[in-house]
Amino acid sequence: MIKKRARGNLSPNSGAKARRKGHNFERLIRKRLLPIYPKCQTSRYASKMLDDNGIDFVGTYPFVIQAKHVERGVNPQKILSEMIIEKGDIPVLFHKKKGYRTIATMWLDDWLENTTKLVVEKIL
């Protein structure tokens, strides 16, 4: 008979642990986005198609957001390039490494365009 491993005793390199950590990070980000975007949902819950396109949250227009909680390096350029977006969407990557604060990454052109709008409208 095959002996099953206890679920709570996952090794640090376990795929199940990494998956659970990623899902927990998505839930944490959603909780922080809710005051700004009350209709925000994870795409795992709301849209399998968006989840497959590398978009982790729905209801955050104009931003399309991917969340990554990683132990090793993340390649933001690759992740932002692989996100399948529509015209007018602004891709953003939230990524966190153990022991560090979460970082938001976006293309410089998108940042400049949005910051310019905020300055012109005297919001900043």
Put a short name on every predicted segment.
Residues 1-124:
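Catalytic phosphate/metal-binding cores of nucleic-acid and nucleotide-processing enzymes, i.e., regions
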